[in-house]
Structure formats: structure tokens, C-alpha cells
Amino acid sequence: MKKVLLKIDGMTCSACSSGLEKYLNKQDGIKTAVVNLVMNNANIEYDEKKLTLEQVEKFVEKAGFTSLGIDNFEKEEKKKSNEKYKLIGISVISILILYISMSHMVGLPVIPFLNMITHPINYAISLLILTTIVILFGKDIIKNGYKNLIHKTPNMDTLVMIGVLASYVYSIYGTIRILQGHTMYVEKLYYESAAIVIFFIKIGKFVESKNKDKTKEALQELMTITPNNATIIREGKEVVVTLDEIQKGDIVICKPGEKIAVDGEIIDGVTHINEAFITGESKPAKKEIGSKVIAGSINYEGTIKYKAEKIGKESTVSEIVRLVANATATKAPIAKIADKISGYFVPVVLVISIISFVLWLIISKDIALAINIFVSILVVACPCSLGLATPLAIVIASGNASRKGILVKTSEALENFHKAKTICFDKTGTLTKGTLSISKIYNYSNLEEKELLKNIASIEKKSEHPIARAIVNKAIEEKIEFEDLKEFKAIAGFGVEAIMKNDDKYLIGNRKLMTENGVIIPNEQDEQQLVNDGNSILFVSLNNKLVALIGVKDILKDNIENVIKELKDKNINVVMLTGDNEKTAEIVAKQIGIEKVIPNVTPKEKAEKIKELKKDGIVIMCGDGINDSISLVTADIGVSISSGTDIAMDSASVILMNDNIEKINELIEISEKTIKNIKQNLFWAFFYNICMIPIACGILENIGIEMNPMVAAFAMTISSLTVVLNALRLKK
């Protein structure tokens, strides 16, 4: 299976996006297709054995739309430029049409040879020519509307096409009658209605497009954040090159005030670097030899040299752009409801307009009035606002979150985050800083402590666990050299197993690892002492005999007590799920205000506990991603804490770009505001249609209130802009 994100041209409303989505999902070889109206893209997963990319793009074209290719911003910008010039042309001609057709109504000077009373033929022919030009400028609307009607996926363009052509064709009929001498038809021409409907729709789409671009600002900022050039060392000399010329393994030099060009690892120098755009943390981070640096971050102080590791699309920035773009390409449950409604909406409007046309034709015997009502219904009921209500808010909220160092990978996670009933936290590296240090070693072996530590550290060097790092750091401090191993095996949730070059077999991990392998633990008094002092305990066996207990202590994260208190104030059940022993877990839990502790659990057992908790409502699991992948997937929403450079964590639907757990409460607030905004948008979209469609049907005709197509087009434009502007409030 292969995934592509195609730029789509020609979508104007929710019926377009939902119609294209349905059509693509019916095609053999396409597994899933999610179409986003705001981002103008389609996220498609297809079987490479059955389809090529060209065939997928042909499906898009058959559905009545145009594929601009993968991330083809150049074509998109060119199209926007063309639309701008078209709009200028339509505006000038539409104003001229309005002047010719309505100047006599508002007391403006009438052009003598175009006077509808004295020169009806000139008047009709001039409006015919000018309106034809406007329709040609707006032919994309007519073309899209026709294609979607043929494919049985009628959309906003279909309604406009039928309305505009009905006015235009009837006006041509009127013009023919005028040429035949029936000058009374001069008052039954609707050329201006056809032209002004296209004018207002084009104006609305242009403003809407500009505002949509504002919603993508966070992504655009990220895409332009890296420098254009960098200084690298080639053949012993400093050379300035473009980013495209940098290769993996190149040594890059970054001076104070410059931006990091590509992701890498410092090999020389010490500095402080601002990574706020990635982590949301404004305080510069200290970087030294061995520290990772991220492209786009700013070097504050010293000159550093670093080895290029991730370039181009592999970089952290590119990964973030991809994740945020993919998040906006997913559908929130609330959006699926809106799409379902819009799927029925357009056909229902078509039926209502036809019934109204027939009824008014029978009642009034006036075909001009019946056409006026028919066109007004079609134009006023365009479902633009309905289609924009959800995706606009999702795009803005995803951008807001990414600015704060929070990557939300799915719209569903964003929608449901504030609905959580329970939040489960792993302990080490999540509630604590994960910067562990050895507090005590009980050595029961015949080896010297330094020799024993050398063997243990040589094994733990191959592990990613925070406790393993503490052991390795201790060995480095003691200037101990590491040994090579014969075999190494990580046992998730238990520890590690290794065989040294001399065939000695070591087991290093928790108590369960010892029990599972039949290792007797006679020194319970020492174990209890370590527990009472708040240590996590590492058990070490050599050839199935316990040879050491190592006590490791951690430091709580800053402000963690307030984070837990805020969550509890929101009536969220907070649980600690940890593989640590009960006593140590309870000491930490008591310090930070967590009442419910589930200790001594393996990754598999964590997942089982989460399944039980899910019976009471939505469960969020927050972990460091090392041992928590199963529980992150099992939870309704998995939150992973990233190192800043490793963000491609498939198991988590939310990634915190730094280790600040306060971001959890920030995301709850973003989620809450986003859903509130979506509900407001949907309310106004439905309220508008509920009010306007009956008026367009002529229910107020008896009291002298009627809606003509020009007013309908203006009202429809205002309705869409109301939704857009309301969504943009989320940026504040």
C-alpha cells in the first residue's frame, strides 16, 4: 500500500469534498481516501500492485476535479494568480452590467443609446454580450457543476450552474422576443442576475481562499524556517553551500546568530539554542558534544560543528509539516456528520427549487417570477458554510497546537481530547525527569564493584531505558571501559538478557524477570531499605544467581503537582501506571497528588488495565514511548513525549515536542475551544439555510418581501464569510 497527498483543484463546497471522497473510496485498488476542503487535498492510500499514481489522478478527473499532483504549490500559486485577474475582469464587467440595467432605478445618468425604453434592442444585446463574457470568466463553475451533475454528485457549483443558465437562457429567449418586436420583454431580462451571481460567488471564493491561506500559516512558517545556505567543511576548507548540497555525514559549522541548517549531532563546541518553534519552550536549551540539533533552530552563543544526520524530507521540520498536514487530512467524527448531511442537502435543494418553480408557475402564471424564485433557491442554498465549518477550525487548531510544541496526528484526537474521563501516566520519564542517578549498589558477587559495574554498563549500553542510561553515565563518570557482548536481548517490560564473551549470562531488570527465570532473592531486607528510600530497583543475576541490587532515584518534573491538580479540577480521573514497585510508585504518587496507583505492571498488563478503564469513558495514556507503545495504541488517545528529533512515533496520536506535561492541559483547552467553534460554525450554517431557503421559496411574497438571485448570491457569500471569520477567532 502507498499513501499520497494530492492537491485538488475545483472543490468549492462540502458536497464537492464528500462527493469526491465517496467516488474515490468506491474505486478498486483504493483502500482509503480522505478529502479536505480547506487544504484542497486528498489523502489517498492505494494498492501499488493494482494502480499507478496516474490512474489515481484519472479517478480524480473522472469525478469532475483536477489533480495538481503531490504538494504542487507552484501550480496552486499560478492558479491563484489567474483567479485574481479573472476576478478583476468579472468585477469591471459586472459593475458595467449593473450600471446599464439599474442606473434608471437609482437616479444615475442613463447611457442614451443603451436606454431600455428608447433602445431596447441595444439594451438587450449589450447585456447579452457582457453577461456572456462574465459566464466565460466563470466557466470553471459551470464546468464543475455539469461534471458533478453527470457523476450524480451534485454540489454547490451544480446549483449555481443550473440557476445561472436558467436566468441566462430565459434572458436569451426574452432577447429573441425583443428582436421580434415584443419590447415588453425588456423588463423580463435576468442577465444581471446571472452575471452578479457569478460575481458574488467569485468574490466570496477569493476572500475565502485568502482566509483559508491564513489558516495554513503555521505550516507555511515551518516550511520556510530553515536557512537557504550553510557553511560546511569540504577537503579541509570551509565552503558555503545550499541546503540541497548538504549530504549525510557532512560537518556543518554554525556561528552565533545563525540557524541550524539540517538535523545533526554536535561534535565540537558548546552553546545555547532556541528551539521554541519545535518545542514551544522559549528558554534556550544548552547544547554540547553529543547533543542533537534541529534544523531551523537559532544558535545563540558559541560556534559549533555538527554532523549532518537528517536532510531534506527526513528532517524534523519536514516530519512535523507532514504530520500536521496529515492531521488536517483526517476527518473528525463531527465532520463526518456534516459531510453526511451535505450529501443529501444538494439533491433536496434541487427538488425544493423544482417544486417551487412549478407551484409559482401555476399560481402566478408568471414564468419570470417562477424562474426568479427557482434561481434564488438554488443560489441561496449553496452549502459552502456547511463544508467550511469543521475543516477550517481543525486546520487552525492543529497549527496553534504545533506552535506550542504539540503535534496532533489525527482530527479525532483533537476533537476527543477534552472529553477524556481518565488520563494514565507512566512514571519514569513522564512524571519524573528521567535523569536517573544511582544512589546505592548492593554487591553480592565475588567481583569488585568496579568490575561488576563494567559488565552491567556494557550490557545496559545497548538499552534505551532511562535506568540503563543512569548505569552507563555512572560508568562513564568512573572512567570505565565497556566490554563487547556475545549476545544481547531486550525483554519488553522486564529488562534485558545478555551473554558476555566468557559465556557468563546476565539478567538485568525488575523482580518479575528474576521470578520468571527462577532466580532466588534472599536479600529482602536490602530490597526493602531501597524501597523505603524511594528508589527504583534494578535486580542483577549472574548465571541465575542474584549478584546485585541497584537503587536508582529520579527527580520529579517541575510544576507536576499543579498539572495533576488542574486535571483533577476538571473532574478527570488521574492514574499512575508503572512497572515500578508499589512502595516507590506510592511515594511518588503521594508527592504529586495522584490517588490511584497501579504498580508492577508489564506493558501487556498496562494495556489490559487501560481496556478496563475505557469502559467508563475516553482514556488518554501518556508515556515516553520506550516501553509504552502497546498501551499508547490501546488507549483512545496516546500521548508520547518526544526527544525533539524522534517524532515518527506511530503508536501515539499526540506528540509533545518537549517533556513539559503542562502541554496536556493546554491541549485540553485547545480541544475544548475548537469543538465549541465548530458547533458555532455548524449552527450558523444550518440557521442561515433554515431562514433563507423559505424566504427564497417566496413565503413572504404576500407581504411584499421577495428575494432575487443577486440578493441570494450576496447572502450566500456573507454566510460563508461569517463561518470563516468565526473560525479565524481560534488564532487569537
Go through the PLM ranges and name each one:
Residues L5, E192-P256, K287, I337, ...:
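Juxtamembrane coupling segments of multi-pass membrane pumps/enzymes
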Residues M1-N122, K212, K237, S318, ...:
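Flexible metal-binding regulatory segments at protein termini and peripheral loops
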Residues N82-N229, K340:
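Transmembrane helix-loop-helix hairpins at the membrane interface
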Residues E74-I93, N144-S167, V321-I354, F374, ...:
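Soluble-to-membrane junctions at the N-terminal ends of transmembrane alpha-helices
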Residues Y85, S297, H418-E464, F494-V575, ...:
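ATP-driven catalytic headpiece of P-type ATPases
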Residues S18, T330, I499-D503, G534-S536, ...:
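Conserved ATP-binding TGD loop and adjacent catalytic N/P-domain core of P-type ATPases
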Residues V106-T118, I150, V169, N400, ...:
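Membrane-embedded alpha-helical bundles of multi-pass transporters
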Residues D28-Y46, E54, L189-Y191, Q220-E314, ...:
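Conserved cytosolic catalytic loops of P-type ATPases
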